[in-house]
């Protein structure tokens, strides 16, 4: 009986967390649909328990809720660890994640591509990325 209660509580917590991150999950679903149309080979990297990691052909990575879309490159494992920090941010911020982290991060990345002078600064010093790194160092093994 006690085990059943623990299981029910776990499912309720997961449901609340899913709803808390609902905006990110909706955008992730749309982005996944786009990737299905654009990429031939999509799969799930099952080595990670903290999130659903979807490797694909792309530059960089994008984290939306519990979904990490990551480009396959030589820095893959390091990138995934960093992106798992973003999943923690999503759990903390919930519906504010896209405003506080997502939009500023993508904007900063785009500005760095448009203005080479910004590339002189370390990308991971930007507040969204620094916080993700700090969280991943603290909580992801």
Predicted regions and their residues:
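Metalloprotease/metallohydrolase-associated module, dominated by Zn2+-dependent proteases
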Residues: 2-44, 56-59, 98-141
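Membrane-helix interface segments
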Residues: 10, 75-76, 92-96
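Short amphipathic alpha-helical surface micro-motifs
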Residues: 34, 50-52, 82
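Active-site scaffold of zinc-dependent metalloenzymes
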Residues: 49-74
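Short alpha-helical catalytic segment bearing the HExxH-like zincin motif
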Residues: 75-87
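Catalytic Zn2+-binding segment of zinc metalloproteases
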Residues: 84-102
